[in-house]
UniProtKB/Swiss-Prot annotation:
Organism of this sequence: Yersinia pseudotuberculosis
Catalytic activity, as annotated: GDP-4-dehydro-alpha-D-rhamnose + L-glutamate = GDP-4-dehydro-3,6-dideoxy-alpha-D-mannose + 2-oxoglutarate + NH4(+)
Gene: colD
GO MF, any single term: transaminase activity
Pathway membership, UniProt: Nucleotide-sugar metabolism; GDP-L-colitose biosynthesis
Protein name (record): GDP-4-keto-6-deoxy-D-mannose 3-dehydratase
EC number: 4.2.1.168
Chain ranges passing through the membrane: 53-73
Residues given in the record as L-glutamate binding sites: 219, 254
EC category name: lyase
Any Pfam family the entry gives: DegT_DnrJ_EryC1
């Protein structure tokens, strides 16, 4: 089988000698478990995104898990089993799995194929008396219209959560995506805006939730809690007693100290990474905004452009399979738009308590006719022009 050279990969490394030196510092210290570097990264992360608190975890998926879990453990629980959470029909699997794992009713709503985010008109009509939260997913770097979502929930006992794992650095009206909800999650996996090997973060302005996140991140013990906290009140002055005191059913989703050290360096570079992604996007939009048979994602606010969606129009002379073949033969990596329509995954949905709010026509459409190619923190002008020339033929 002929091996095709990759000319335009989905992602590329964001590291240089600064990250390698950070790793070496941790190796030299001989302290590999979560410590001062993680703590500093959390401080830097919260400051960068304008949030009071940040908790680093092992991945964006575990960030979602802790975000949902924490809402069951507040003094006045914000969730109970059976509560309804509205989600878009297009997202990554671990947006949904924590909802199932905690016995919540998942209510799927169609997306808008222009923005790839939840359809706002369908969201409004999807709300029921059981709805407790909207888990908004900012897809492929594109923030939701949170002004509209806030207006929809006005006067209702409904809070907003954000899965911002694909949209680090996106903004709406000058405010960072991930900070519009009660909590927001981020990913720093290799292919994302910054990379800490594996890694994720949860941010919040709520101190009680912050303390719960600290507790359930590491075994549900009190060891990492402040001396006075919202879970146990005043901790014992005896460190031996507090070292193995368990108060919540937690996990072990701690990050490595190495990941924290890398993250400190990566955050310094994030503004330039986002700037270059947006420069690439400007070229992409100029070339593809009037393409005869391809639609592109419509930007809301200031996208951080995780990747570039290519959605075939109904009048397209080629199928998606033919589009994929063209791209692969040209050495251009591509993949479906996240998972496509998640509702096609009947094998796993049999474990869910879920409802569907009407038709999911746009989710189905992008599932069959959409894909995306990568965007990077480096200049891709030649690759994007080449992509356009290939699809002009």
């Amino acid at each position: 089988m002929r091996k095709i050279m990759i000319n335009f990969p989905l992602a590329s490394s964001t590291w240089d000698e600064k990250e390698l030196n950070a790793i070496q510092r941790i190796i030299d210290s001989n302290m590999f478990t979560m410590g001062e570097s993680v703590k500093q990264y959390e401080k830097d992360f919260a400051e960068y995104f304008g949030s009071k608190y940040s908790v680093m975890v092992s991945s964006g998926s575990t960030a979602n898990l802790l975000m949902i879990a924490a809402l069951f453990f507040t003094k006045k629980p914000k969730f109970k089993r059976g509560d309804e959470v509205i989600v878009p029909a297009v997202s990554w699997s671990t947006t949904y799995f924590p909802l199932q794992q905690y016995g919540l009713n998942v209510r799927f709503v169609d997306i808008d194929k222009k923005t790839l985010n939840i359809d706002l008109d369908k969201l409004k009509s999807a709300i029921t008396e059981k709805t407790k939260a909207i888990l908004a997913v900012n897809l492929l770097g594109n923030p939701n219209d949170f002004d509209a979502i806030t207006k929809i929930t006005e006067g209702k006992d409904i809070f907003i959560l954000e899965d911002n794992c694909e949209s680090m650095g996106a903004r709406l009206n000058g405010k960072q995506a991930g900070t519009y909800g009660l909590m927001g999650t981020f990913s720093s996996f290799f292919s994302h805006h910054i990379a800490t090997m594996e890694g994720g973060c949860v941010i919040t302005d709520d101190e009680e939730l912050y303390h719960i996140l600290l507790c359930i991140r590491a075994h549900g013990w009190t060891r990492n809690l402040p001396e006075f906290n919202h879970i146990t009140g005043q901790k014992s002055i005896d460190p031996f007693e507090e070292s193995f005191k368990f108060v919540l059913p937690g996990y072990n989703v701690r990050p490595l100290e190495m990941s924290g050290a890398i993250g400190i360096e990566q955050l310094k570079k994030l503004p330039s990474f986002i700037e270059m992604r947006r420069k690439n996007a400007t070229i992409f939009k100029e070339l593809f905004s009037s393409h005869p048979y391809i639609d592109i994602q419509q930007e809301t606010g200031e996208s951080s452009w995780f990747g570039f969606a290519l959605i075939l129009k109904e009048s397209s002379p080629i199928t998606r399979a033919e589009l994929v073949k063209k791209l692969i033969e040209a050495g251009i990596e591509c993949r479906p738009i996240v998972t496509g329509n998640f509702l096609k995954n009947k094998e796993v949905l049999k474990f869910f308590d879920y409802t569907i709010a009407g038709e999911v026509t746009d989710a189905e459409y992008i599932d069959k006719h959409g894909l995306f190619v990568g965007n990077h923190q480096i200049d891709l002008s030649e690759q994007i022009k080449n992509l356009f020339n290939i699809l002009k033929k």
